[in-house]
Regions:
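Basic, alpha-helical nucleic-acid-binding regions used in initiation and control of genome expression
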Residues: 1-375
Length: 375
């Protein structure tokens, strides 16, 4: 029977909170604590999210801090869910609130790799501050963001603990204070750009989570990259030149592949670290990426699609959906020969406009047949 929970600290992982409860409660066995906390008897406590809690435990959590606050402020949802499309993000959030395991399939987590080869990390300087302020330290969310090796506040390298994040590891509730040593080595990062990126990403991670936006992260990135990397017509980006400059900017260190960048710009990939990396390269302020302004929704309309929309008197969104479908098919065909020659972006733009017109005409019908549905 659980009678109390300790104070929940700022940015503390829910796993850390339950671990401190276990340590302070004097259980004779881990199994007794797991039985009191969780619905499933043989559960392995999740280091990044929350396993299904017993009803009476959930009631205590609600009274203490609220399930919404626990999910938004004390799990890794801000990393894996921040840049998802609105509908998918909302579905994942509901699954997390219900403590339903299918959230793993909804979040932007590398397939079958959540926790693989990773351990809980800590910042030596944050540990010192925690011990001074609270008399103990705890596991911070901000130190567990995949791809970031540096504390965004102090600019020092994060240290690895012995606590595995593997989902198949032996069950445990490892309290940070009992795991992290008293004597700590501090290694400052001397790479200014790497430290700046860590601080940039951490500030976005800590920002308020938007659930409704008129502009997707892919649309926003393309909008901000269009001026320096747009093709002649403005429909597409010169991906090869963009990728080359991006690699040079980061010195080829921890950069994503060109294919992964393309998927992000097509709205098919939502990796938190890679998006932050591309955004910082593009010079986008933290505040704008954390909460993409709705005011630019009308500005991002593609000029070619606007032209077709006005000429044919059709809804812009219909024209855009058809045009993007044509673009994807064209790019897929040309990608096969990319290694053999330079991609002819301007030529592609010239060919796109008539193709979009032809496709829309077919969808509209000839007056005798019904218009086709666009999916």
């Amino acid at each position: 029977m659980i009678a109390f929970f300790p104070e929940l600290y700022e940015d503390e992982l829910a796993y850390s909170w339950f671990s401190r409860y276990y340590t302070k409660s004097g259980y004779l066995s881990l199994r007794y604590a797991l039985d009191d906390l969780y619905v499933k008897r043989y559960v392995n406590p999740d280091t990044e999210f929350v396993n299904e809690l017993r009803p009476e435990v959930k009631e205590l959590v609600i009274k203490h801090c609220g399930m919404e606050n626990l999910i938004l402020g004390h799990t890794m949802f801000s990393s894996y869910g921040r840049f998802l499309p609105d509908a998918k993000k909302q579905e994942a959030y509901r699954a997390l609130l219900d403590m339903n395991g299918n959230f793993n399939n909804l979040l932007a987590i590398p397939k079958n790799r959540r926790g693989t080869g990773r351990t809980l990390r800590y910042c030596p300087l944050c540990v010192k501050e925690d011990r001074k302020a609270y008399g103990e330290t705890y596991w911070h969310r901000i130190h567990q963001i995949q791809g970031i090796q540096i504390c965004g506040r102090h600019g020092c390298y994060l240290a690895e603990s012995d606590v595995s994040m593997e989902r198949k590891a032996a069950p445990g509730l490892w309290n940070a204070e009992s795991v992290i040593p008293e004597k700590l080595e501090v290694r400052m990062c001397e790479e200014e750009k790497e430290a700046t990126l860590a601080g940039y990403a951490c500030r976005i991670f800590e920002g308020r989570m938007p659930f409704k936006s008129r502009v997707s992260v892919a649309e926003f990135l393309k909008y901000r990259l269009k001026r320096p990397y747009g093709s002649a017509s403005g429909v597409s980006l010169c991906l090869e030149r963009l990728y080359q400059d991006y690699r040079e900017f980061y010195g080829n260190k921890n950069v994503m592949t060109e294919t992964k960048m393309q998927k992000i710009l097509l709205g098919k990939r939502w990796n938190f670290y890679d998006i932050c990396q591309l955004s910082m390269f593009a010079g986008i302020p933290v505040e704008e990426l954390a909460a993409i302004p709705d005011s630019i929704a009308d500005e991002i309309k593609e000029p070619v699609f606007m032209q077709v929309s006005e000429e044919l008197g059709l809804d812009y969104e219909l024209v855009r959906s058809v045009g993007e479908a044509v673009l994807r098919r064209y790019e897929a065909r040309e990608r096969v020969q990319r290694r053999k020659r330079t991609f002819a972006w301007e030529k592609m733009d010239e060919e796109l406009l008539p193709k979009v017109r032809e496709t829309i005409a077919l969808l509209q019908g000839d007056g005798m047949t019904r218009p086709q549905r666009v999916t």
